[in-house]
Amino acid sequence: MYGTRSSAYWSTQPGKFDVLNLRMTFPSSSAYEIPDLRPTTYVPANLAAWNMPRHREYAAVSGGALHFFLDDYRFETVWSSPERLLPRVQAVGAALTPDFSLWRDMPRAAAVWNVYRSRWCGAYWQSQGIEVLPTACWATPDTFDFCFDGIPEGATVAISSMGIRSSKVDQALFRAGLQELLDRKQPRLLLAYGRLRYCDDMNLPEVKEYPTYWDRRRKQVSDAWAEEDPPVAAVPLEPEDATAPGKEPGQAAWVDLEAAVEPPEAAGAV
């Protein structure tokens, strides 16, 4: 008998073989087949960093959402291991799409790829019943024809001006991209991580600003933010800390998130 023997394993791929996540594709109206996200009316009460466990726990019990305004290496695993990291997103129940970076000197193919990955993660999470809000990111005007693909019109969109330096060129590019977002997608609400700067004279829709990690640490949160965020969250202490001052052994204790938060340099990516 000639030929190659069959194997039950030939119909499946070995682990980590599908690094492009081609096992799952989603509907798209984009020329680059960047997945389309469904609109949502969900507005998170707060934003929790992907790599901050205590913040994630607080967001899970307070109507918050995960954010990815971090260095890219800290959340690369949401793309490289989407199924393995899905429970972390499900535990909170809502998330912004990953903010994979776009740089001015980035090759166009790499920029399209990062936009694709961001929307793909959002579409995958939506398919698993998670509330997803798109994060808009752009670089130079030649990215405008694809960087907003997949964002629904008239929806809530997350942005941040944190990475903008004092350079007038950077500020002008941010303003140009924001105006393009408004013209193309007409968002009904902008969620801004940190103060939304450099656009006070623009005709913006409603804007909801969220304090950053350092806003909280440096006590620079405005009175309005302080009133919206209660300082004490209903999150139990870890087992080794279960007996807090003034509490009997076994009695429930509460965590002051501002005091207990771990510094970002100590919180690595998974």
UniProtKB/Swiss-Prot annotation:
It comes from the Viruses. Pfam families: DUF4417. Residues 225-249 are annotated as: Disordered. InterPro entries: DUF4417. This is Gene 1 protein. It comes from Mycobacterium phage D29. The lineage of its organism: Viruses, Duplodnaviria, Heunggongvirae, Uroviricota, Caudoviricetes. The gene is 1.
